Amino acid sequence: MTSPGSPQRIVFIDVDGTILEHGSVIAPSTISAIRSARRAGHLVYLCTGRSAADIHPDVRAIGFDGIISNGGAFGVRLDAAGGEEQVLAHLMPRELVDRMISYFEDGGIHYFLQTDDGVYASPGIGAMADEFFRQRRERHAEDLRALGMDDDEAPLPVIAYRPLSEADLGQVVKSTFISTDSASLDRAQADLGDAFHVIPGSIPLPGGSNGEIATLGVNKGSAIVEVLDLLGLPAADAVGIGDSWNDVEMFEAVGTAVAMGGADPELQAKADLVTTGVLDDGVHNALVRLGLV
């Protein structure tokens, strides 16, 4: 747990399933709690698997001291004027990018490639992604009703991705794959695990599976270690808040790990404490419980 009496602590907070519910809805208490923690002198960094270009503008508008993106491949420090200073960057070696793409193509697996500036989709992924986003729109409306809001108060943004042909393969840091085969994740872990970090994805696909692939050793936890070293802060005074399997290394790198109420029970078991759900003031309740608000 975090050491008592520290004048300043740092919070690393996931986006999807932690700040955002189903891609676009933010509990008002989350916004006020993060801003209150920063006003109290604590640092708050986003720590997300998304590329920087894919972070919802409403999330950015909350205000943060820095961003770890692409699952730990990139990190920036933010200033009060909105300027960014890049503090870490770990590109996937080109030979690994080629190996990963060949694996997908040979196996008939649909995928997205991530760079710092965007997301690129393989041909044929459109229909599967469109169905996922249709389901997300339905859940978005349900989330708004749960908060007493109308649909037009927080419209769902258009999900934008570019064709694979436009990707600079020398700038790739991560991929997300989608398959109708429920065994594809296990196979990818077995076939690629010698050089890649392969973890379950978060896209709900009945009858299929999906995952995220990054360079072995590049993850949220490794990025947090770099940021803490840069800032001269001890891990004991760091807090990590998340909900999915790409948060495991974050939990291991911080002094206090907080799992969201909707997280997988196995992930909750790895946390120091479990807060409530995203729309049930989960982030706010965690920061209050830790004395940061």
Where are the regions that the model predicts?
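Active-site phosphate-binding/coordination module
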Residues: V25-R139
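Non-catalytic pre-domain segments flanking phosphatase-related domains
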Residues: M1-V15, S32, R39
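Short, structured coil segments at secondary-structure junctions
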Residues: I62-G63, G71, L192-D194, A253-V254, ...
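Short, acidic loop-to-helix structural element flanking the phosphoryl-transfer center
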Residues: S24-A40, H90-V97, P155-Y161, V218-D229, ...
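Mg2+-dependent phosphoryl-transfer enzymes with acidic/Ser/Thr/Gly-rich catalytic loops
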Residues: T2-I10, A27, N210-V293
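Short active-site oxyanion
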Residues: A40-Y45, F64-D65, V173-K174, A236-D237, ...
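Conserved acidic, metal-coordinating active-site core of Asp-based
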Residues: Q114-V239
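Short hydrophobic/aromatic-enriched beta-strand-loop microsegments
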Residues: F64-G72, H197-P200, A257-G261, T276-G277
